[in-house]
Amino acid sequence: MKPDAHHVKQFLLRLQDDICQTLSAVDGANFVEDSWRREAGGGGRSRVLRNGGIFEQAGVNFSHVHGDAMPASATAHRPELAGRSFEAMGVSLVVHPHNPYIPTSHANVRFFIAEKPGADPVWWFGGGFDLTPYYGFEEDAVHWHRTARDLCQPFGDDVYPRYKKWCDDYFFLKHRNEQRGIGGLFFDDLNTPDFDHCFDFMQAVGNGYTRAYLPIVERRKAMVWGERERNFQLYRRGRYVEFNLVWDRGTLFGLQTGGRTESILMSMPPLVRWEYDWQPEAGSPEAALSEFIQVRDWI
């Protein structure tokens, strides 16, 4: 089957609706929608939930942009894309909870197609989800990775290990020499064996996010926390900001293509702190995080 961008777009719009409804039901607060247009072509729907019962900020963004020429960030590694028009669409979300015992979560699914007359289209899917805890709980990590493995299983025994490793490699702060969190799944440039197979997998990842995350939220939301835990959460959120602004390809692509800055930076935590050369107290729960986020096989 030839690539069907319209079909993908309809799924992504439904996915945004489903995730927002699910998160709102858990939190009790509603998302505010901001529809926007891109002068160079396309637009999107940005939805943000602020200061809810559980989530300090949750952003779920749909975007569909198109243009006559590829940006430098895309053609640098793929010269075959030069001179092609393109469409890029996706749903991207980040959830920052109030409670430091609830991890931050991120998910993204996307589709890209570039075309020119007289040539076959160049297309691929990408996406994944990853978890960033502030205090580590093994049962949460096992559940997160088991959900990821189970959704990958129908697509082959090698899919979960491959995309888990890719996630571990991608969400790594080189300047800190540390992982951003405990990973999950990350895939990109997926275009084999055919469109239907790849689209099915992207849908499985998108639909699997809430199954992976919400049981963890339910387990941790009633845990009591105070100023110490909050300060550590804000400090660790700094790593999130550093990764997104320095290393994340999606952020750089969005800014280089003239994307909507407010939507691109919606992933940023609402509050964050840096402290020069801060070190956790030896033997403390905060000190245990550095070991907890080391790459390992959770299941």
From Swiss-Prot:
Keywords: Cytoplasm, Heme biosynthesis, Metal-binding, Oxidoreductase, Porphyrin biosynthesis. The keyword Transferase does not apply. Its cofactor is a divalent metal cation. The keyword Cytoplasm applies. PROSITE patterns: COPROGEN_OXIDASE. The active site is at H106. One of its GO terms (biological process) is protoporphyrinogen IX biosynthetic process. It catalyses: coproporphyrinogen III + O2 + 2 H(+) = protoporphyrinogen IX + 2 CO2 + 2 H2O. Pathway: Porphyrin-containing compound metabolism; protoporphyrin-IX biosynthesis; protoporphyrinogen-IX from coproporphyrinogen-III (O2 route): step 1/1. HAMAP family: Coprogen_oxidas. Involved in the heme biosynthesis. Catalyzes the aerobic oxidative decarboxylation of propionate groups of rings A and B of coproporphyrinogen-III to yield the vinyl groups in protoporphyrinogen-IX. PANTHER family: COPROPORPHYRINOGEN III OXIDASE, MITOCHONDRIAL, OXYGEN-DEPENDENT COPROPORPHYRINOGEN-III OXIDASE, MITOCHONDRIAL. Homodimer. This is Oxygen-dependent coproporphyrinogen-III oxidase. It comes from Salmonella paratyphi B (strain ATCC BAA-1250 / SPB7).
